């Protein structure tokens, strides 16, 4: 009980002290999750309701908003907030008093949507700008009388910039499409948050390397420096990446995405013992059959390089669908045996959990790349980007699976799994140098593929917009290249 606007009402008394809260300095309403206790049974017969979510106006008595932080000299709104004995009505609970204790579900559903959009799209946009700028700059910048784009070392960095940007674009577009259709993709959102921000960091690093001295001198014409400085912010907020990789991606997906484990857990907790026993037996035998099927599929697909695996399309990307099928079966087999032999201890084996998460992530990202390619009309000129992206992702899945087996604590099980998963060894190869050269050509040559890769970047030709000015310089460079070549030849003579 407490006073609210002159009346005595039943409400909630809150205490909190949070250090790093995004938008806190400018917020008029705080979204607060807290554990709700009712020892006096004022709203029901329960002592502890658990996690509850409420909206608290920042002008409420007792709410303190601290000084704004200045993270890495970037204009990112973040700051502390605290509250001491803040009394608010029960109606401030999101959904009203009947939603007390249901805050965790709200948080997960909200995060499953927001986490898939905000930071991944920011990373994708940064990648598009970096790709567009780096491709043009590498052509314009001359070293030893030749464009640095012609140096294979620089080309290697340009390939990664373009390929990683394509992966981010695909992941964001496909996952956002699922959200538009009403899905709340908890596992894909965790995958996107981690991998898009990490790929964004790699793109920023490579773009800085390509630009060299131009990128490290701060000033009005430095279009990379601030973005490079801001990358750790995206890595940190909305769930630190180390935690996301080692616990969240596989930890959420193992039960949520498994066709039988969730049914087994629900049956085991059924209050009706007879019904629970029937459901558990049905799920258990289905699980056993599923494991045997995956063992056979994994062995056969690995032995035949998945050449006989049925796929929905007969296109130049057909083999990539087949390879995803192969590693999907291998992942399911490894995951089942990990849960069977390690049980609850698997969540403490964070290195193993992280590698399983890496495999799952690589397959999901490869799937989004193929879907994105289809959505954009199967443009043949984009095939080098698709091939580099999928090959890179599936090679990473293979290496993560190898590392998982190499470090699996039960060596007998690891040997058995290796026999079924890699009967011919690790046969999948990373992208070749020829593919990389084709990707470099796409990112450094004016054309549809270069424009599509950075289609959402602001490229208008106007004063103060470096992307538009770089593109104009690139077009002029291509137009006058024959004249420049004749001048160089005349100078030599």
Give the role of each language-model region.
Residues 140-156, 374, 378:
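Terminal amphipathic helices with adjacent charged low-complexity linkers/tails
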Residues 153-180, 198, 205-208, 361-372:
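Loop-to-helix element that buttresses phosphate recognition and phosphoryl-transfer chemistry
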Residues 61-87:
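Flexible, small-/acidic-enriched active-site or ligand-binding loops
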Residues 82-115, 132-149, 171, 294-316, ...:
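A glycine-rich, basic-preceded beta-loop-alpha segment at the flavin cofactor/substrate interface
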Residues 204-228, 404-417:
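A glycine-biased, small/acidic residue-tolerant capping/turn segment at secondary-structure junctions
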Residues 7-64:
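A short core secondary-structure module
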Residues 286-493:
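C-terminal amphipathic alpha-helical interaction region
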Residues 183-215, 384-397:
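Charged, glycine-rich active-site and insertion segments that engage polyanionic ligands
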């Amino acid at each position: 009980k407490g006073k609210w606007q002159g009346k005595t009402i039943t409400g909630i008394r809150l205490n909190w002290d949070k250090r790093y809260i995004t938008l806190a300095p400018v917020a008029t309403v705080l979204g607060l999750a807290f554990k709700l206790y009712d020892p006096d049974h004022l709203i029901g017969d329960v002592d502890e309701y658990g996690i509850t979510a409420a909206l608290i106006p920042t002008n409420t008595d007792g709410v303190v908003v601290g000084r704004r932080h200045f993270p890495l000299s970037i204009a990112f709104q973040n700051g502390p907030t605290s509250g001491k004995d803040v009394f608010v009505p029960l109606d401030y609970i999101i959904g009203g008093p009947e939603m007390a204790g249901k805050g965790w579900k709200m948080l997960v559903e909200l995060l499953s949507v927001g986490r898939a959009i905000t930071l991944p799209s920011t990373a994708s946009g940064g990648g598009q700008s970096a790709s567009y700028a780096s491709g043009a700059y590498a052509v314009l910048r001359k070293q030893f009388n030749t464009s640095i784009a012609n140096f294979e070392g620089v080309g290697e960095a340009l390939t990664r910039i373009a390929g990683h940007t394509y992966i981010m674009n695909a992941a964001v577009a496909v996952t956002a499409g699922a959200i538009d259709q009403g899905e709340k993709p908890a596992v894909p959102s965790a995958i996107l948050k981690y991998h898009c921000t990490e790929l964004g960091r790699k793109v920023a690093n490579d773009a800085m390397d390509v630009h060299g001295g131009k990128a490290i001198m701060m000033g009005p014409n430095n279009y990379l420096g601030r973005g490079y400085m801001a990358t750790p912010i995206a890595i940190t907020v909305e769930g630190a990446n180390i935690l996301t990789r080692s616990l969240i991606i596989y930890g959420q997906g193992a039960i949520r995405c498994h066709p039988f484990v969730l049914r087994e857990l629900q049956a085991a907790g059924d209050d009706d013992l007879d019904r629970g026993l029937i459901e558990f037996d049905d799920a258990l035998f289905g699980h056993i059959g599923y494991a045997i099927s995956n063992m056979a599929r994994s062995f056969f697909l690995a032995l035949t390089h998945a050449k006989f695996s049925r796929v929905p399309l007969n296109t130049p990307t057909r083999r990539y669908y087949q390879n995803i099928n192969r590693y999907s079966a291998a992942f399911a087999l490894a995951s089942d045996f990990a849960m069977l032999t390690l049980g609850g201890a698997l969540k403490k084996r964070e290195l193993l959990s992280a590698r399983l998460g890496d495999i799952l992530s690589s397959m999901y990202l490869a799937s989004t790349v193929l879907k994105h390619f289809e959505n954009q009309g199967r443009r043949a000129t984009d095939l080098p980007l698709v091939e580099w992206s999928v090959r890179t992702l599936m090679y990473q899945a293979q290496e993560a699976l190898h590392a998982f087996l190499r470090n699996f604590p039960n060596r007998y099980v690891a040997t058995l799994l290796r026999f079924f998963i890699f009967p011919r060894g690790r046969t999948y190869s990373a992208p070749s140098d020829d593919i990389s050269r084709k990707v470099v050509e796409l990112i450094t040559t004016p054309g549809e593929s270069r424009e599509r890769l950075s289609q959402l970047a602001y490229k208008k030709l106007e004063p103060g917009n470096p992307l538009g000015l770089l593109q104009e310089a690139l077009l002029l460079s291509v137009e006058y290249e024959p004249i420049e070549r004749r001048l160089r030849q005349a100078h030599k003579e």
